[in-house]
Amino acid sequence: MAASLQAAATLMQPTKLRSNTLQLKSNQSVSKAFGLEHYGAKVTCSLQSDFKELAHKCVEASKIAGFALATSALVVSGASAEGAPKRLTFDEIQSKTYLEVKGTGTANQCPTIDGGVDSFSFKPGKYNAKKLCLEPTSFTVKSEGVTKNTPLAFQNTKLMTRLTYTLDEIEGPFEVSADGSVKFEEKDGIDYAAVTVQLPGGERVPFLFTIKQLVASGKPDSFSGEFLVPSYRGSSFLDPKGRGASTGYDNAVALPAGGRGDEEELGKENNKSAASSKGKITLSVTQTKPETGEVIGVFESIQPSDTDLGAKAPKDVKIQGVWYAQLES
């Protein structure tokens, strides 16, 4: 920026006056904007060579100013491009104040375990799982590729939602059988989060990340089950034409009378549906700490996306991530 100001100051210096010249008086307000004192200097140039010289100086000055601005922007972006924060234990998170956590991304992370064993080492019995946290680390959507005639496959996406997609404070009964199998039932907690991702082609896919009413069973290294996926929009939500599932207009299509508003191609737009659907999740235990009752692992969930109250066909969304829980006997 200093270089651009110096170049601008150079252009403000007077040049020799020749015949057939055009006098350009410097503007006092422009000088003050650059922090320069106004001394009544004049910038003069001939219609031929002097004008070309002035234009060349202007181009050089703009290049210097542009380079200075680009460098400043690069420095600012580089300074703010910090990586994900270090994953903390439950006790470390609890010991931090609000200001220490604010803006760091820690509030969107599940805790980890310091120490422990790389196996499920809880005795058979009935436990109560609490503080269950599920943190997604990747979202993929089953869709066609950017190029034509490509088969359906799970495409990588770009997250459009802020760091508010982690499920937390989930609890429910957790049972360990004598044969080593486990069973978990979700009962309460922050068990849903609205998320929107963007496909490579630009299409945005909203969905409700959830494990509502989950009943998962199996071995600790792989126990799975189905869960309820509520409608992304509630039944009282109204579209731009005032149509809803439980309120609003029944039909809002500007067509002549004769039942055309109930035709099949328009029925899905007029007849809103807030019906729930099903998803499936598989959880795996990777590490436990029996003395504190802590368990961590990984999960993979496949669930449908938003249907716009029945107007669109849902897409399969695969969510992978890590989870944490505490077991109390």
Curated annotation (Swiss-Prot):
Molecular function GO labels: oxygen evolving activity
Species of origin: Pisum sativum
Biological process according to GO: photosystem II assembly; photosystem II stabilization
Spans annotated as Disordered: 258-281
Family: Belongs to the PsbO family.
Location of the protein in the cell: Plastid, Chloroplast thylakoid membrane
Protein name: Oxygen-evolving enhancer protein 1, chloroplastic
Function text: Stabilizes the manganese cluster which is the primary site of water splitting.
Keyword Cytoplasm: no
Taxonomy, superkingdom: Eukaryota
Feature: transit peptide: 1-81
One cellular component term from this protein's GO annotations in UniProt: chloroplast thylakoid membrane
InterPro entries assigned to the protein according to its UniProt record, in alphabetical order: OMP/PagP_b-brl, PsbO
Signal peptide boundaries: none
Keywords recorded for this protein, A-Z: Chloroplast, Manganese, Membrane, Photosynthesis, Photosystem II, Plastid, Thylakoid, Transit peptide
